[in-house]
Amino acid sequence: MKETIDFLIDTIEARQVLDSRGNPTVEAEVFLECGASGIAIVPSGASTGAHEAHELRDGGSKYMGKGVLSAVNKIHETISPALCGLSALDQTAVDKLMTEIDGTLNKSNLGANSILAVSLATARASANALDIPLYRYLGDPLSNLLPVPLMNVINGGAHAPNSLDFQEFMLVPHGVNNFSESLRMGTEIFHSLKSLLDQKGLSTAVGDEGGFAPNLSSSEEAGDLLLEAIQKAGFKPGEQVSLALDAASTEFYNDGIYKYEGKSLNSSEMISYLSRLVSNYPIVSIEDGLAEDDWEGWSELNKELGDKVQLVGDDLFVTNTERLRKGIMEKSANSILIKVNQIGTLTETLEAIELAKMSGFTSVISHRSGETEDTTIADLSVATRSGQIKTGSLSRSERIAKYNRLLKIEEELGNQARFAGALGLGPKNI
């Protein structure tokens, strides 16, 4: 074992780089006394919840105001001097010090993007110093569960310039024994879907997350296309491959009304609509079926559908333990979406996952629409045995990078590897 001093943080570098949408984001590199280092790049969302931690942006004319040099400077001028000399192995202390220096509830002083970049890079530096994979460093010897992928193959809403109000229509290939076969199934259906869209004269242009973005008349048309693509690829809907939705309902909600497909619906009417979809399609998961502050509606939704499908809170919970506790008390959902940049530190992310698990909620580890080549979430999904991951479609290399990382992890684990399959949708089975 190396001497403790070897794990002390020596220096931290940061720079402005680009994400998958061509927008600036923060990369941080943490160097330890022993010579090991770790790099992390933070993602950014398009449909962001009002309660998310604050990203620091420059404003002004450069990069249309989206530059992050101010966040980079915060790392160089404030975070690095404060953290140098701390043990990188004490992730909690590192993250706590950054949040204390920031001094705000939403990290608006230092910026969640600067804090998170350093937080994740610190963990990776520690793993590299110990010469172990990140999933093993963050997890334990039982961290061997590969997640079921929720593959966003039809994009709508804020993720695509088309007519669909719902943001994501996903494949859930669960009816196999390992991750690599699940990935193969999803890939074959993706190509089957592309062929179908071509045949129907529909666009095969892709959205932010690599899924197709055709102009369709309704969510039902999207669902029908997915069922046809699954069958055309030789698989059985519901038995081998199910469907999942991200309604991102906050995006079309205002003053108690959901403006959906040209109609004005109240919460009860929206719940009835979602219930019909569940009855007519093999849907196993609905994310953000209602708006982020429609707490009463969420409780009704959970009463109606909570014993039938996974109800995932994204904008509802924003990876925040306080909002999650409220949701647990009010029985508002049964699952939480985990996005590291919504809360801004690795420690708080792990706390949210643990609280969900203790409360009988599932957790779904997720990317953002503005992604990078960073593969931390792949390791995080295995480390925490979450059983599910959302990392986009089967195109765009920033999405594929996470799938490829999971393939490598499965190979490293060998016969110790387990695959969540259908079990990934129920925490009692993990």
Swiss-Prot record:
Q: Please give the Pfam families that the UniProt record associates with this protein.
A: Enolase_C, Enolase_N
Cofactor(s) the protein needs: Mg(2+)
Q: Which GO terms describe its molecular function?
A: magnesium ion binding; phosphopyruvate hydratase activity
Q: Which SMART domains match?
A: Enolase_C, Enolase_N
Q: Give the UniProt record's GO annotations in the biological process aspect.
A: glycolytic process
What are the record's GO terms for cellular component? Answer: cell surface; extracellular region; phosphopyruvate hydratase complex
Question: In the Enzyme Commission scheme, what number(s) does this protein have?
Answer: 4.2.1.11
What's this protein's name? Enolase
